[in-house]
Amino acid sequence: MAVFMNRINMRYISIIAAFAAAALSCFASVASASEGQAVAAAPASSPVVAKILKANASVKNIESKFTQLKTIKASGRKIASEGTLYFTPDGHLTMRYSKPAGELLVVNGNKFHMNKGGKAMTFDTSKNALMGSLANTLVNCIKGDPETVAAANNAKLAASETAEGYVVTLTAAAAGHRGYSKIVLTYRKSDCVLVKMVMEETVGITNTYEMKEVKKNTSLPSDAFRIPTK
């Protein structure tokens, strides 16, 4: 896919940027070159990425608290949000906001639901390739498979071990006018679970998501991935 998220309507991008998606947003989401320009493919799997993927292979589900800090470079304004995240690696993700209350992001099968500012939208990802790509990006980042995200979007990938954790950076080879120029994922060393995601937009907005009180292989609420009916 020659264009990495920069063709998504900015109204939807701003909703995902409120994620968390996120999270992380977790919710997903690196800008790429303009359409028609070549973008370097991701390199072969690094030892760090291989370790992250292997460690997450035994994860059946995740529940965590998350915080989001949106920083607008031009004004210096900062907007804080928070909520609860539910995830299973087979393609289910919910980011349920407590602040602002009522905001919601759900990926469930081929459905992608968002509620932002009281406006609800549900997409069929089997018919909407862009939203399908975005859903896959979010899911694969959380499940510890950033290489699949990089390969699917022709983004550059770099991985390293730092004092903070295992850090994977996805970077657009040439930033478009819209979308994300970079995503930085931090997986904690103890079990390679995603604990931080920084998403940098080409327009000067940065969203930082942090996962706290992470529980793995736990009992999730029966309605964790339910999409609200109209």
Question: Language-model features: where?
Answer:
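Bacterial N-terminal signal peptides
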Residues: 17-26
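Gly/Pro-enriched, hydrophobic low-complexity segments
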Residues: 148-230
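Short hydrophobic/aromatic-rich beta-strand segments that constitute the beta-sheet cores
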Residues: 66, 93-97, 112-115, 168-170, ...
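An acidic-aromatic
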Residues: 84-136, 207
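Boundary at the C-terminal end of the N-terminal hydrophobic targeting segment
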Residues: 28-40
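N-terminal secretory signal peptides that target proteins for export/translocation
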Residues: 1-12
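Flexible, processing/modification-adjacent segments and terminal tails
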Residues: 43, 48, 53-65, 70-72, ...
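Short, surface-exposed coil-to-beta transition loops
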Residues: 80-82, 101, 108, 178-183, ...
